[in-house]
Amino acid sequence: MVSARWNRVAVVMGTLVTLAGVMHFANPTFFDDIVPPWLPPSERFWTYASGVAELIVGPLLIVERTRRIGAVSAIALFVAVYPANLYMTWDWRDRPWNEQIVAYGRLPLQFVIVWLAWKVFTSMRTPAVRNDRPAR
């Protein structure tokens, strides 16, 4: 049984991840700029690849039947894109302070998001089956 709280968290997270995936295609230049340029083959490739991943992971989180795999996939995705957050923080070091706050704020926020995805995953665990019947 899933608690109502973690059900809501999963649906909200899934919706936000899906919207982020859409934005990778609607405004790819923004995402290109935060991809570390040393990653082959190109920034646009990684923008689209992470957008596709988000478009897959988001709905997996929303649908209760696929939520466990969605939560694990979300954790993997959030860990995989963390280098882009680090690069963004470094790359934005000369930007106005309000933009730097956004870049620095993403670093600890990513840990919170991973923790939330983990909590969604653990909320979906099947309770252990108790066998109170005596042995034959």
Predicted feature residues:
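Membrane-interface extramembranous regions
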Residues: M1-R136
